[in-house]
Amino acid sequence: MVQGFKFSGIAAGLKKNGGKDLGLIYSETPAKVAGIFTRNQIKAAPVLLDMQRIASGTCQAVIVNSGNANCCTGAKGMQDAISMAHWTAAKLDIPEEQVLVASTGVIGEPLAVEKIQSAIPDLIRTLDAGGVSSLAEAIMTTYTVPKVVSREGQLGGTAFKVTGVAKGSGMIRPDMATMLCFVMTDIAAEPSLLKEMLLAAADRTLNRITVDGDTS
């Protein structure tokens, strides 16, 4: 795994089946960050929030839930996304603007944020450098196999590691759609270079996939 990152995934009661549904990625120091997002004109509250915050070029945590997408939820949905970041930042003792939010699941239903607030202390308590599998389980929706991969390589004579975690097996059409993908690395790169590499990789992979022909 990539050094400097910790992960966790727990059950907060958002899913009806009682499975893990709340995850956290935490960087021990502020990390350089880049991101790409759905091109759908209708964007969920967490997407809109992250598009604003990622412009700073740094991030230290990502809190993500499954079971509810917090999409088409209006002003209340945006406040809920902001609250998720606020509660996480307070418990981690980091700036609120350094926390990104992601949600996946049912569209158009209010998010049970009180359950998330209650679960955040346990979510942070269980952070572990080897906890990426728990994170992968926590972001699962309708499929049955957690998606985690790690690779090592050399760049200019310097060793590096990359770890990726993703969710999604349906409702995928080029340009991201409903899937989530988080990539962590110890490569020392500025946000502009990270964005360039991310776009190039996505164009050759994620943006060529169509499943169900649905971009919702």
Protein language model regions, located:
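Glycine-rich oxoanion-binding loops at beta->alpha junctions
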Residues: 37-55, 141-155
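Glycine-rich anion/phosphate-binding loops
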Residues: 40-46, 74-83
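N-terminal glycine-rich anion-binding loops that anchor highly charged ligand groups
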Residues: 16-26, 54-62, 214-216
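Short beta-strand/turn micro-motifs at beta-sheet edges
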Residues: 51-52, 169-172, 210-212
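Glycine-rich, mobile lid/loop segments that gate access to catalytic sites or pores
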Residues: 82, 87-206, 216
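A short, flexible beta-alpha/helix-coil linker loop
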Residues: 31, 68-71
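N-terminal amphipathic/basic leader segments beginning at the initiator methionine
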Residues: 1-42
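Glycine- and acidic-rich phosphate- and metal-coordinating loops
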Residues: 60-67, 98-104
